[in-house]
Amino acid sequence: MKNKDYPLRTSMDELSTKNDNEIDLEKGPLPEYNSEDGSTLPPYSDLNNPKQMGQNITKLFNWNKSTTPPDYDENRLPITDEGNNPPNTHRENHSSGTTDNSSPFLIKLLISFTSIILFNAPAVCYLKYKDAFFKNYGAAEWTLIGFWCASSLIIFTFSWYFYETWTKAVGKGIKHFLKKWRNIPMAFSEVFLFNILVGSPRVALRHISGERWGLKCSLADHIIFAILSILVFIVETVEPGSSKINIMKRLRGDNARDATQHVNEYTAVPLREMNPESEA
């Protein structure tokens, strides 16, 4: 076996540059690596200790907080190699994957039940005022009560099932209504005039119907009239004069259309009279 002798001109610095490592002057140069058995390691190498090996790798690549990429996040989903890579999205901390925006049970029940109370309050107050609350009821009266209870149940069911929808709609309507508060006095005056003009036919109908049917007709026309008054008040507050303006526009539109047709029929001039040279 031949001995390998290094020439005298080769210095320790040149060996360090050649091997790309720093040589410990006390321990000497690194021994040669035997590729056949692969077991030869430097006697003073830190790789003999696995813990130090991990620390050296960390120091080598400088894995610390200062060199962490800004877009890296432990909560991001891993990128797969199948097909198109999905975008980096944060994981949601919801068990069902959807947010629950529903209102609390008690508030939902209270508001839905309040709508039924407001629906039944006028009828109950009127019956108590007439001292006819569950007194001397016949088949027709009990049929009407049953129909009223069924209507209340249907209203409560819809109020409960579509709670989120109708509460948002009512909230937006109230906000829009409050923006038009300057129109409220005029709308109230128009509703008052509406009650005066329609009040006399209601009184006549109650007298014509008689005592037996007077209660039902009076109750029905009171409810219908109250609803109409509320609708007129809302419409005239949000858009004053909208109903009257629409009627006037239609009348003006019909008159203008008739006048236009009349002008076209009697004042149209033939083209040959306008251009007599065209005949020649």
From Swiss-Prot:
InterPro entries: WTF
One GO CC term on file: ascus epiplasm
Annotated TM spans: 105-125, 142-162, 184-204, 218-238
GO biological process: meiotic drive
Biased composition (Basic and acidic residues): 1-29
Domain of life the protein comes from: Eukaryota
Region (Disordered): 1-49, 64-100
UniProt keywords, alphabetically: Cytoplasm, Endoplasmic reticulum, Membrane, Toxin, Transmembrane, Transmembrane helix, Vacuole
Keyword Endoplasmic reticulum belongs to the record: yes
Role of this protein: Promotes unequal transmission of alleles from the parental zygote to progeny spores by acting as poison/antidote system where the poison and antidote proteins are produced from the same locus; the poison component is trans-acting and targets all spores within an ascus whereas the antidote component is spore-specific, leading to poisoning of all progeny that do not inherit the allele.
Protein family per UniProt: Belongs to the WTF family.
Subunit structure: Homomer. Forms protein aggregates. The two isoforms can interact with each other and with themselves. High sequence similarity is required for their interaction.
Protein's UniProt name: Meiotic driver wtf35
